[in-house]
Amino acid sequence: MNGNASKPKPPPSAKVQALIRNISRAERGPESRVDRPKSVVFSYWTKMLDLIGFALNSQGFQFQRIDGQSSMSQRKAALETFGGDPECNVMLASIGAAGEGIDLTSASIVHIVEPHWNPMAEAQAVDRVHRIGQQKDVYVISTYSGYKGTSND
């Protein structure tokens, strides 16, 4: 599923702002676009992926998305674009749809923005990035909401 959201944008939450800040820091990395790290953003809730997609669009990020509504051909196209396009550095993925059976080793940063009730599901999702064939160090960032507009990384 292409990550081009067209609905009106709600204001981003503190958690989404923290996520965008972290992705932006990674984007400002090496000069060569080829060397810039790719990020996978996992969420248990697809509505959260919608909100993150709005924020990424507003900041000009190119991204792909996989969730339970993605057909096999959409999943394949999203994975090929994410893995092969140096301009596409973010993959939004629901833990349920992308937690097993796919290879995301082109990424080196994993963001967990909505924890799954089963920690093993999160571990399997992280393993899509950190698996045999991975040539880079993998960083996992879990972002949890606090209160009064705060976020904890």
Role assignments for model-derived ranges:
Residues 74, 89-153:
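SF2 helicase/translocase ATPase core recognition
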